[in-house]
């Protein structure tokens, strides 16, 4: 079978390797689609601090069951699935308490261990989640980033009836906003400096879409929600400007959730955060229930994934996909690799 390998930053080759043998507790997945995310792009540019080369990428993935290990039940040949890419120890304090996303030895497929970018991939059945038969493989490859959004939204607890602001309308911010609405938020405002991203958010049903190049962030919140502003602000951009906005304009005693991976060392006014008794939370990846909830939200028509797909590339055009992203950064949301297309 064919397997992708990033040998060095900006260099991708393909090699012929045997189809992996399936162990008793594993399934063999015929890989269909793979999404490219911001962390993959960091690897492509040699800027991911926890990835060494060569590496086979692929952690946002969909496929179908091709073979089932003898100890595995609950799956059928040909069944559509996605894969949870975390590899965890199961023994550390977080793992023992069900928070394996915080494992002390956490590895992620496509970064610290072999990813799914191959025609077939053998994986523990415990990491495989079925997706509905009427869900496309492209959408299936986006369940992973949706799970990130679901887990992030849940850091606030029950958001039903709340007023919510999301900073950053890229794929994760868009999905956070959609998830919050899908979970019952009363009103959701999203901000960005890209009209295209805001148009996508509007297409996905977000209530208020604001370009903060043209409108003051604080004024926009008051216009959207009144003087009480938002109950929670989700920072899905992750830089000093956006976190500064969140801290400055958050209602006193409210919550800020940092969803984005912060860009470098933070320089923010913690004196204001302290004086306003702001509750600043963070979020890390997801757990199985976030996958299940994300799939349910899509199935119920509360989250829309297709509008976020900008372009699809054949497997052998993996490098061209990265080049396309670099050349069209301002107009690209999500690029998908079709592994079964030559």
Please provide the spans of the model-predicted regions.
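Mid-domain Rossmann-like dinucleotide-binding core that forms the NAD(H)/NADP(H) cofactor-binding site
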Residues: 135-214
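Glycine-rich beta-strand-centered segment in the early N-terminal region that forms part
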Residues: 20-34, 47-93, 127, 132-134
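C-terminal hydrophobic helical "lid"/dimerization subdomain
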Residues: 3, 244-248, 288-342
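Conserved beta-strand positions in the Rossmann-like core of class I SAM-dependent methyltransferases
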Residues: 66, 188-189, 257
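N-terminal glycine-rich cofactor-binding segment
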Residues: 3-21, 38-67, 82-83, 100-114
């Amino acid at each position: 079978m064919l397997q992708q390998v990033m040998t060095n930053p900006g260099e991708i080759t393909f090699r012929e390797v045997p189809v992996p043998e399936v162990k008793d507790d594993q399934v063999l997945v015929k890989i269909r689609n793979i999404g490219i995310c911001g962390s993959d792009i960091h690897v492509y540019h040699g800027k991911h601090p926890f990835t060494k080369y060569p590496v086979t990428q692929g952690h946002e993935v969909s496929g179908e069951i091709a073979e089932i290990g003898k100890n595995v039940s609950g799956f059928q040949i040909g069944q559509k699935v996605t894969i949870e890419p975390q590899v965890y120890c199961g023994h550390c304090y977080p793992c023992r308490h069900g928070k394996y996303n915080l494992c002390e030895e956490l590895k992620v497929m496509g970064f610290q261990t072999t990813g799914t970018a191959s025609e077939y991939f053998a994986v523990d059945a415990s990491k495989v989640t079925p997706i509905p038969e009427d869900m496309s493989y492209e959408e299936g490859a986006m369940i992973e980033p949706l799970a990130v959004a679901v887990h992030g939204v849940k850091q606030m607890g029950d958001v039903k009836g709340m007023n919510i602001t999301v900073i950053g309308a890229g794929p994760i911010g868009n999905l956070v906003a959609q998830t919050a609405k899908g979970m019952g938020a009363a009103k959701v405002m999203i901000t960005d400096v890209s009209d295209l991203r805001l148009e996508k958010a509007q297409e996905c049903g977000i209530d208020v879409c604001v370009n903060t190049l043209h409108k003051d962030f604080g004024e926009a919140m008051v216009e959207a929600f009144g003087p009480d502003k938002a109950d929670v602000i989700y920072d899905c951009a992750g830089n000093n400007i956006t976190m500064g906005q969140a801290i400055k304009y958050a209602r006193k005693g409210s919550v800020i959730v940092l969803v984005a991976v912060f860009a470098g060392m933070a320089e923010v006014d913690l004196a204001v955060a302290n004086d306003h008794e702001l509750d600043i939370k963070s979020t890390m990846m997801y757990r199985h229930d976030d996958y299940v909830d994300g799939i349910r939200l899509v199935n119920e028509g509360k989250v829309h994934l297709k509008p976020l797909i900008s372009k699809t590339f054949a497997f052998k055009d993996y490098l061209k996909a990265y080049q396309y992203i670099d050349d069209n950064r301002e107009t690209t949301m999500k690029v998908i690799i079709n592994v079964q297309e030559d």
